[in-house]
Amino acid sequence: MMSPTLMILISITTMAILSGESFGAMPAQCNSEFLEELPPRLRKICVAIARIWDAREMNDFVDDREYRENLPRYDSSVKRQDVDHVFLRFGKRR
């Protein structure tokens, strides 16, 4: 049976990996300075990680841009003229 300390350490490590916190940055070995010195297989892995990283950043950018574009724009100087605009009143009757 495992000791409680080891079990806690394994649990924390697993949660960090699953939540993506441990993948916050590119590995130091994938730095462009060291990339030429790496074996071909590790170079392929670094390229794959870089592509995933770029796709993730692009998705975050697109999601953020779509969110900002869908925010309502209020212009208080112009009153609405459309017929579809209806004011509803909720609360006690007088």
From Swiss-Prot:
Entry annotated with the keyword Secreted: yes
Propeptide stretches in the record: 25-80
Signal sequence annotation: 1-24
Any GO BP annotation: neuropeptide signaling pathway
Keywords: Amidation, Cleavage on pair of basic residues, Neuropeptide, Pyrrolidone carboxylic acid, Secreted, Signal
Entry's Gene Ontology cellular component terms: extracellular region
Pyrrolidone carboxylic acid modifications at: Q81
Function: Myoinhibiting neuropeptide.
Protein name: Myosuppressin
Species of origin: Camponotus floridanus
